[in-house]
Amino acid sequence: MDLDYSSDNSRLVADNQNNKTNTKNQSQLSTSSQIPQTSQSYQQQQQHNQQQQQQQQQKQNSRPSSPKTIQAKVNNNNNNNNNNNNNNNNNNNNGATISHPPTSQSNEDLSSSAEIHHDDSAQLNSNIFENLGFVIDITINLKRKMELVKIIKKNGGKSCYSCTKATHLITTKQGYLEKTQKVTQAISLGIPILVKEYVHYCAFKKELLGVENYLVSSLILNPTSTTLNSSQDLIEKPNEEEPQNGTINEQPIAMTIDNTLESNKPIETIQPSSLEKQEPKETELQTQQQPQTELKSELEPQQLQLIQEKDKNINNLSIDSNHMDTSKIEAGNNISNQTQSNIISSVVQTIEPLKECNKIDLDNNNNNNNNNNNNNNNNNNNNNNNNNNNNNNSSSNNKNKNNVDEAQEGLNINSVMDVHLTSSTSSTLSSSDNQDNELLRDEGTTPKSKKKFSQKKNHLLNLKKSYQDPEIIAHSRPRKSSGGVSLVEALSDHANYISNLDGFKYYARANKSSLNSNATTSGGNNRSIKLNEYKYDDEEEDEEDEDEEDEEEDEEEEEEEEEEEEDYDDEDLNDEESDEDDFDSDEDVSRFIKGKLLQKQQKIYKDLERFEHSRQQQHHHHQSSQVNSSKPRSRSHSRDYIESEIAKYLLNNSEKQIPLSPTKKRSLSNQFHQDGGNNTTDGNLFNNFSTNGGGNRTNIDDSIKQSILESPSSSSLKSSKSKKSKKPFLPPLSTLVHILVTFIILSAFFMSLPSN
C-alpha cells in the first residue's frame, strides 16, 4: 500500500532506499523506522493545539454566551479542525485511511478534499484493499473471518497473519478494549486497526466497503488512555444511490478514536460535503457544561438556538444542584401527618389481636406515638416554610425528596414496631402469608391462567394452611364413598358373568403373588367362581381380554348356526305340509346329502380350530404358571368336554334336519341309548378326532358320508321316495280354483273384443 509522508520522512525513505538493494524490505524497514519520529511530531502539535483550546474554553466560560461569541468559537474550532486534519493526513500510519472503490468520481472527490484542506499530501489511494496485508484478531468469529478474507482477496488484497508484514489489523470492539496480543503488537508497530462492528455490513453485501463507515485508529497518541468512541459518536451516513454499474459513489471520511481523557478529547475531522447530514450529540454532563467544539463550518440559525437552550439548561442544572444539598437535609427531617397516621393505624391493627393475649402493652406505644405526632406537627410547620422557599426546584429534586421521605417512613415504622414486639413474629408471618394467599388467588382468577398453574397454586395454598393448622390435613383427605364397591367384589361379579356363558369352562389361574382362588363348578353350563384374593398382572389382563374376544366370537357363530338350523327346520316342515316332491329324483337326494355334508364339515372344522387354539393357549399357560396345584388345570375346552358336546350336537341336528315319516319316526337318541352308544358314525368320528387331533380331514369326510348313507334317515328317504313315485299327482284345491277363475276372466275378456 503506497503511503504518503511529510517532507522529513521522505528524505529518510530516500536514504534507506539508496543503502539497500531490495525495495520491498526497504519499504518495510522505512515504515517501521519512521513511525516514532512522526509520532513525536504529531504529539507535539496536538499538545500545542490542546493548550490553545483550554485557554479559549476558560475565556468563554467566564463570559456569557451570545450568538456572536458562539460564531467566533465556531470559527476558531473550525481552524483547529483544519489543522488537525492536515496533521492526520500527513501521518498516514497514525490512522487516516479511507475506503472507496477505484473510480474516476472518487478521485475527483479526493482532489476536492485536498483543495479544501490546503494540503497536497492529503490525497490518498482510492482503494484501501489494494496490496493490503491484514491481520484478523482472534476475537472475530471464524465464519465472519472467512467472509472478510474472501471480500478482501476478491478486491486485490493479500492476507497476512504476522504483524511484522501487515498494514492493518481487523478486530472487535471487545478485543480492542481488552488489548489482545494482536492489538498490543499493532499498537507497538503503529498499524491501523479496523473494528469489525463498522465493517460487518460489507460482509453481508458481499461487496467492497461502501457508504458504511469503518473505524480507523490512531493509536500512537496516548496508548495508555485509549478509549473507543461509542456508535452514537461516530458519523454514519445513510446509503447513497448506487449507480447502474454496481459501484458505490462515496466521499472520503477520516475517522479517529478517543485517545485522550474526557476533558481533552480530540476533534473529529469532518468534510463540508458531509456536514449537512450530521447532528451534534451529547455524551456526558462535563461535555454539556463545556461549549461544544465539534460543530459544522456553516451553522444554521435553528442550531444556534438549540445551543443557547442547552447552555440555559446547563445553568439551570447547576443552580438546581446547589439547592439539592439543602433540600435533602431539610426533607430528611420532615414527614406528613397523613403518612404518619396511616403507619400508626397499620401498626395498631397488627398489635390488636396480640393485646388480647396480654403479650403487648400499648401504653408505651401510645406515649411514643403522641411524642411522634407532636414532633411531626413541628416538622410540618417547618416543612411548609421550606416548601414556600423551594417552589422553583426542578422535578429531579422532588423525586429525591420522595425517596428520602420513603426512607424516613421506613425508619419510623421500624422504631414503632420495635417497642415490646417480642412475640410478634407469628402475627407478621400470618399477615405475609395472607398477602401471599391473596396474590395467588388474584393470579388464579385471571382468564389466561392454565390448569397446571392453578393446581400448583392450590397445592401451595394447602401447604401453607397445613403448616399453620396441621388439623387441616386430616380434614382435607379424601374419604371413601359409602356405596363404593371393592376390587374383589367387582372381580367376582365379573367372573360370575363370564362363567354363565354357554359352552365354555372357566378357571382361575393361580400365581404366587397374584391369585389365591377356589373355583367351584356347579354342573351344566352354569359355572361360578369364588375369589378370595386377586391381583392383576399385565400378562393376565392381556390373556383375559383375548379369552373374552374369543368367547364373544364363538357366541356369535353359535347364534348364527342356530338361526340357520331353525330356517332349515322351518323349510323342511313347510315342504312336508305343502309339497312332497323334494325327493322325486336321485339328484335331489344327492344335493341334500352334499349340503348336509358341507354343513357338518364346516362345523367340525370350526370345532377343530377352536380345539387347536385352546391347546396352544393351554400349553402357554402351563409354561407361564409356577403354581403346584393338585388338580390339572387346562383351558376351557377339554377333550372329554368337546367330544360330549359334538355327540350331543350331532344327535340334535340329525333329529331336527332329517324329515321322517310319522309311521317310522324314531329318535336317534333312543337308538343311540339302545345300541349302548356303539353307533358306528359317532364312534368313527370320535376315533378320528382323538387320534388325528384335527389333522386328517379326509378320514372325517369319509366317515361323515358313510354315517349319512348308513343311517336310518337314508332308508326312510328311500322308502318315502318309492311311495311318492306310486301316488298320482294332484294339485291342491286352492290352485285349481285359482286356475279356473283366471280362465273365466280371460275368456270373458276375449269374448268382449269386437270381431273383425
Curated annotation (Swiss-Prot):
Residue ranges constituting the BRCT domain according to the UniProt record: 124-216
DEED region as annotated region, ranges: 537-588
Keywords, sorted A to Z: Calcium, Calmodulin-binding, Nucleus, Repeat
UniProt xrefs under InterPro entries: ARM-type_fold, BRCT_dom, BRCT_dom_sf
Quaternary structure and interacting proteins, as annotated: Interacts with calmodulin and CBPD1 in the presence of Ca(2+).
Biased composition (Low complexity): 16-66, 75-94, 285-298, 364-401, 422-432
Entry's localization field: Nucleus
Gene Ontology annotations of biological process type: regulation of mitotic nuclear division
GO MF: calmodulin binding
Name of the protein in its database record: Nucleomorphin
Native species: Dictyostelium discoideum
PANTHER family, per database record: NUCLEOMORPHIN (PTHR28034:SF1), SET1 COMPLEX COMPONENT SHG1 (PTHR28034)
Compositional bias per record (Acidic residues), positions renumbered to this chain: 536-587
Pfam families linked: BRCT
Disrupted-gene phenotype: Mutants lacking the DEED domain form multinucleated cells.
Cellular component terms (Gene Ontology): centrosome; nuclear envelope; nucleolus; nucleoplasm
Top-level taxon: Eukaryota
UniProt motif (Nuclear localization signal) ranges: 464-480
Principal subcellular localisation of the protein: nucleus
Segments for region (Calmodulin binding): 495-512, 589-606, 596-613
SMART domains recorded: BRCT
SUPFAM superfamilies reported in the protein's UniProt record: ARM repeat (SSF48371), BRCT domain (SSF52113)
Bias (Polar residues): 1-10, 95-113, 514-529, 668-691
Compositionally biased region (Basic residues): 448-459
